[in-house]
């Protein structure tokens, strides 16, 4: 097996983990819809970032980017629509459709490498609202609706994407994977610390997803 083939294997594994990470978050929202702390802005930006990575994969011939990001767009959109929010689901769906359409049109008008770096930029910014909310959860010791399993899978996915990027010399993916992985570690640590003092309490909703 060549280095290139091994790298593609890591890419497909990263894509599979990226798709799987959405499932625990959806399950947690459905089971505990009243829990706060999940950022709809973060998940909406995740939809846009994955749409850009999908377009980048189409234009660059990076096949591992295609199935995972397409499914992740659908999964992240489901999270946005399922979570409790003062904004109606119809309006959220319309905003996702308009934003996605504008980004997709832009992605086909700029150079391929620029699409990769735009996807990296959107992906990086997508974690900031959730990171901000999780800092608040940590300070208030809130057992939030954020799924720890989702962020653990996200970290594992980014490690695989980094291995893919190193094996294929794909700079945009390498930079994006490093930043997303480190942010994921910070998120996981904050949410774990926020829940630690509550262990043993009969009122705590434990991590079931």
Annotate each language-model stretch with its function:
Residues 1-209:
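Alpha-helical membrane-protein topology signature
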């Amino acid at each position: 097996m060549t280095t290139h083939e091994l790298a593609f294997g890591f890419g497909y594994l990263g894509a599979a983990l990226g798709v799987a990470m959405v499932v625990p978050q959806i399950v947690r929202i459905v089971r505990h819809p009243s829990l706060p702390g999940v950022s709809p802005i973060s998940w909406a930006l995740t939809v846009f970032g994955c749409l850009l990575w999908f377009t980048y994969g189409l234009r660059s011939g990076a096949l591992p980017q295609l199935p995972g990001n397409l499914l992740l767009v659908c999964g992240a959109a489901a999270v946005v629509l399922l979570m409790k929010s003062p904004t109606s689901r119809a309006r959220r769906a319309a905003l996702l459709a308009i934003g996605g359409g504008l980004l997709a049109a832009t992605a086909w008008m700029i150079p391929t490498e620029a699409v990769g770096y735009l996807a990296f930029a959107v992906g990086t910014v997508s974690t900031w609202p959730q990171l901000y909310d999780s800092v608040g959860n940590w300070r208030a010791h809130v057992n939030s609706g954020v799924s720890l399993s989702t962020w653990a899978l996200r970290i594992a996915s980014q490690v695989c994407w980094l291995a893919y990027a190193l094996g294929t010399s794909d700079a945009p993916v390498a930079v994006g994977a490093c930043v997303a992985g480190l942010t994921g570690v910070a998120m996981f640590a904050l949410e774990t610390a926020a829940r630690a003092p509550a262990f043993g309490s009969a009122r705590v909703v434990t991590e079931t997803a």
